[in-house]
C-alpha cells in the first residue's frame, strides 16, 4: 500500500526556515536513524556531534542509508548470496525514495528519512546512483590497474558522500563541491593505505597494480601470500602522498562552509590525514599491523579543528580531480531557484560560543574513536523490521 510522500510528511525543523514542529512520524524516523548509527557506526555518530543540528539530522539519514547499503552487500557475501542482487535491491529503494514512496523494506524508517532529505535538499540521484555503482564494483571483486582507476572507485564510494554533505551545508559552487569530493577521496585512500593487510586477507586488493609491478611485485602472487616488504612500503607511501595532496587542497573548501560547520569537517580532515602519518611512523607496514592514532593525538587534532575556524591564508584554487568531475557537475547543476533551501548561517553563532560548546564535549567525542578502532566495519546497523 502506498504511503504518504515523506518529503511532505517529514518537515525537518532543523533544515527549514519555518518553525513547524516535527511530526510524530518524523521524530520516530530520525530517532531510529540516530539510534542505528550510535550502535552500528559510533565513529560517525560521535563526529557528527561537531556539526550543527541543521546538518547533523539530515546527515544521519544519509549516512544511515549508506551504512545499510554497505551492510546489505557485505551480508550477502557472508551469507553466500548474490551481492549483485543486494545492489539491485538497494536501487529499488532509491527508486522509491526519489518517487516519494517509502520502500517496503526492513528499514522503512531510514527509507522515509532518506526520501525527505533528498527531496528537501534536492540531492541529485546521480550521487546516490554513483555510490551504489561503487558497491557494485566491490560486488564484482574489481581490482584497479592505475591510480586513476582507484580514484574513480574512491569517488563513487566516498566522493559522493563528500558532495552530499556539502549540499546539506548549502554549498553549490563548483569549487566548494570539488574540495568536498577531494576530502572524501582522500579519506578513502587513507583507509586503503591503512588496511592493506586486512583487505588482502579477505581477498581484496585496492592498491594500483601498475604501482605494484613498478615495485617488482606481481599483484596476484602477492595477494595469495601477502607480506610486507620494501616494495609494498613504496606503494603505500605513494598512496599516502596522493591523499596528503588532496587534504591540503581541502582548505579552500572549508573556507566556503558556514562557520558552524567547519569544526566537524576540519576534524574529519585532520583525523584521517593523521592515519597516514601514523602509517608512516610505523614504517609504512600496513600489512602486519593496523595503524591506530593515539588518543592524546586525537584530542590535540580535535582542538585544532575547534580553533582553526578561519582560513589562515587564501587557499589557491585547484582543478577538480577528473574522477570527481561528474559528481561536481551533477551537484552544482540546477534548473531552478534554490533560495527556498535553508543552510546554516555562518553568522548564526559567534565563533567563541562554537568553540566553547564543542570543547565541552571534545574529550567525550574522542572516546568512541578509540573504542571502535578496527571494529566499526564489522558492526551491522540494527534497524527495526517494521516501521514505527
Where are these regions (language model features)?
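Catalytic cores of Mg2+-dependent Asp-rich isoprenoid enzymes
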Residues: 2-186, 193, 198-388
Amino acid at each position: 500500500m502506498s504511503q504518504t510522500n515523506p518529503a511532505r510528511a517529514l518537515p525537518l525543523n532543523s533544515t527549514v526556515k519555518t518553525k513547524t514542529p516535527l511530526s510524530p512520524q518524523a521524530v520516530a524516523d530520525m530517532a531510529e536513524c540516530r539510534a542505528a548509527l550510535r550502535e552500528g557506526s559510533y565513529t560517525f555518530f560521535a563526529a557528527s556531534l561537531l556539526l550543527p543540528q541543521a546538518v547533523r539530522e539530515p546527515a544521519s539519514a544519509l549516512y544511515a542509508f549508506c551504512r545499510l547499503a554497505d551492510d546489505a552487500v557485505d551480508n550477502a557475501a557472508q551469507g553466500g548470496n548474490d551481492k549483485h542482487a543486494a545492489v539491485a535491491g538497494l536501487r529499488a529503494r532509491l527508486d522509491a525514495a526519489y518517487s516519494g514512496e517509502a520502500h517496503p523494506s526492513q528499514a522503512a524508517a531510514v527509507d522515509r528519512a532518506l526520501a525527505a532529505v533528498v527531496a528537501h535538499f534536492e540531492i541529485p540521484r546521480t550521487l546516490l546512483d554513483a555510490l551504489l555503482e561503487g558497491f557494485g564494483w566491490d560486488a564484482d571483486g574489481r581490482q584497479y590497474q592505475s591510480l586513476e582507476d582507484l580514484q574513480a572507485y574512491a569517488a563513487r564510494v566516498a566522493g559522493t558522500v563528500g558532495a552530499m554533505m556539502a549540499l546539506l551545508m548549502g554549498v553549490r559552487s563548483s569549487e566548494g563541491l570539488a574540495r568536498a569530493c577531494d576530502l572524501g577521496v582522500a579519506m578513502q585512500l587513507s583507509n586503503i593505505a591503512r588496511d592493506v593487510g586486512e583487505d588482502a586477507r579477505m581477498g581484496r586488493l585496492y592498491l594500483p597494480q601498475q604501482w605494484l609491478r613498478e615495485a617488482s611485485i606481481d599483484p596476484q602472487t602477492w595477494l595469495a601470500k601477502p607480506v610486507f616488504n620494501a616494495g609494498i612500503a613504496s606503494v603505500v607511501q605513494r598512496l599516502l602522498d596522493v591523499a596528503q595532496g588532496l587534504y591540503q587542497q581541502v582548505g579552500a573548501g572549508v573556507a566556503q562552509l558556514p562557520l558552524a560547520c567547519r569544526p566537524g569537517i576540519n576534524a574529519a580532515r585532520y583525523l584521517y590525514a593523521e592515519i597516514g602519518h601514523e602509517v608512516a611512523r610505523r614504517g609504512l607496514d600496513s600489512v602486519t599491523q593496523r595503524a591506530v592514532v593515539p588518543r592524546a593525538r586525537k584530542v590535540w587534532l580535535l582542538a585544532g579543528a575547534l580553533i582553526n575556524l578561519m582560513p589562515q591564508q587564501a587557499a589557491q584554487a585547484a582543478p577538480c580531480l577528473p574522477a570527481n568531475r561528474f559528481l561536481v557537475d551533477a551537484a552544482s547543476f540546477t534548473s531552478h531557484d534554490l533560495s527556498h533551501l535553508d543552510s546554516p548561517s555562518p553568522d548564526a553563532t559567534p565563533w567563541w560560543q562554537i568553540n566553547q560548546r564543542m570543547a565541552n564535549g571534545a574529550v567525550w567525542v574522542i572516546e568512541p574513536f578509540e573504542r571502535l578502532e578496527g571494529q566499526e566495519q564489522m558492526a551491522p546497523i540494527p534497524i527495526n523490521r517494521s516501521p514505527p
